[in-house]
Structures are given as structure tokens and as C-alpha cells.
């Protein structure tokens, strides 16, 4: 941290997005204590057969699936995700992406991945928010893995109602057919890693995978920040 950053930190201290404790000069978004106590899933060690991967069985051609942490509404982790999505904090997404990537490299999760493909927002929603939180996660992952981010290869063409209070079947109906591929050439013959913030029923990621599945030679895997533990 340079002198100007230290000065800014003095007049406007950086706080942990989970516990609110003041961060040290070497900490980013999360303090070391909260990083240590994140409810990690360890799904990356069994990427073909874990509770998240099982959501896609017989529904989408997804090779491996994993989430970094378990997510519960109204928890400390939910506060972190809320900050990422709704409090104009793209830097939190990048920091979490770096943290995810560092953990997942140990399990060789990124082996043979060619591209990071963030799940897109609609143009209206991205304009309202100022950024796509999934893209910020992907940018952070890219900083560690040096994998390219294909942020414009997939488009969300319509916005339907929020998924928050819908059943699994309603969620699937809500997202069916809403994603379209805008750059087929960059995806041909590639192993793409779909990046999203939270996986609850897998409906959004399934819809993305279905939109991608017809591309020649494509392989699809997924990685999310959180997985809702039912």
C-alpha cells in the first residue's frame, strides 16, 4: 500500500465486509480471521459428484461444478454478497475472485480450462448496478490464473421477475431461453468455465449451458462464489 492509499485508509478506513473490523494494509475486503472461517464447500475436490454438480445431472452438459462457500440468507456471508451486488463494490468481487482462485488452484480445478465466461446481466440491470458482479469475480480469478475473460460472448436478452422467492421449477421456467450466444467463434472447441455469484437450484447455469451446448466442440464447467445449502 503506497503513502496515498495509507492516507485514504486513515481518513476513510477500509472495513471487513463480513465482520466490520478495520482491515490491515495487506488485507483486502475480508480480514484474515473471516477468511479463515469462511464456510468452504470443498466441492472442488469432487467436481463431478457433489450436491451442486448433482443439480445438473440429466439437465445440462456440465463436466464439473463447484462453489467456494456455502451461502445462507440473512447470514454474515449474505451480508458480504449483498455488499458485492448492491453497494457499488466491484472491488469486493475481484478480491473474492482472487481468493476463490487461490483455493481452487490447489485442487487443479482450472486445469484445461480455456476461458472464463461470466453469467451476464441484462443491459438495464448492469446499467443500474454499474457492473456485473459475476464478471468482477471472473476478473479476480483471471488475475490469479491468467485465463482470459469472455465477458461479451453470452447475452441475457430479457429480464424476468427476480428468482429469489421462486420454486425450483418456477426458476427454470423463468430463465429458459433467455441467454443467447453472441460470439460463437471464440467459444468453438474451448473448455469454458461459467462464473456466477450464487447457485441455488442451478436454473440460471442450466439455461446458460443449454444456450452454449450447440457450439461445436465446446466443453462446459461451472464455478460460483456461493451454494445455497438446503
Spans of model-derived segments:
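Glycine-rich phosphate/pyrophosphate-handling loop used in enzymes and phosphotransfer proteins
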Residues: 1-195, 200-230
Amino acid at each position: 500500500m503506497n503513502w496515498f492509499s495509507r492516507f485514504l485508509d486513515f481518513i476513510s478506513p477500509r472495513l471487513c465486509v463480513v465482520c466490520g473490523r478495520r482491515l490491515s494494509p495487506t488485507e483486502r475486503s475480508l480480514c484474515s480471521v473471516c477468511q479463515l472461517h469462511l464456510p468452504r464447500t470443498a466441492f472442488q475436490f469432487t467436481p463431478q459428484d457433489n450436491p451442486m454438480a448433482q443439480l445438473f445431472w440429466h439437465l445440462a452438459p456440465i463436466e464439473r461444478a463447484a462453489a467456494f462457500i456455502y451461502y445462507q440468507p440473512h447470514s454474515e456471508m449474505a451480508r458480504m454478497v449483498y455488499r458485492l451486488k448492491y453497494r457499488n463494490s466491484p472491488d469486493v468481487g475481484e478480491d473474492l475472485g482472487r481468493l476463490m482462485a487461490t483455493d481452487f488452484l490447489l485442487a487443479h480445478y482450472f486445469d484445461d480450462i480455456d476461458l472464463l465466461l461470466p453469467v451476464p446481466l441484462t443491459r438495464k440491470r448492469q446499467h443500474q448496478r454499474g457492473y456485473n458482479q459475476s464478471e468482477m469475480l471472473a476478473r479476480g480469478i483471471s488475475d490469479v490464473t491468467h485465463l482470459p475473460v469472455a465477458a461479451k460472448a453470452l447475452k441475457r436478452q430479457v429480464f424476468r421477475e427476480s428468482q429469489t422467492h421462486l420454486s425450483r421449477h418456477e426458476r427454470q421456467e423463468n430463465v429458459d431461453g433467455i441467454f443467447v450466444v453472441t460470439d460463437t467463434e471464440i467459444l468453438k472447441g474451448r473448455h469454458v468455465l461459467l462464473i456466477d455469484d450464487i447457485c441455488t437450484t442451478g436454473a440460471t447455469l442450466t439455461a446458460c449451458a443449454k444456450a452454449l451446448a450447440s457450439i461445436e466442440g465446446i466443453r462446459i464447467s461451472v464455478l460460483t462464489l456461493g451454494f445455497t445449502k438446503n
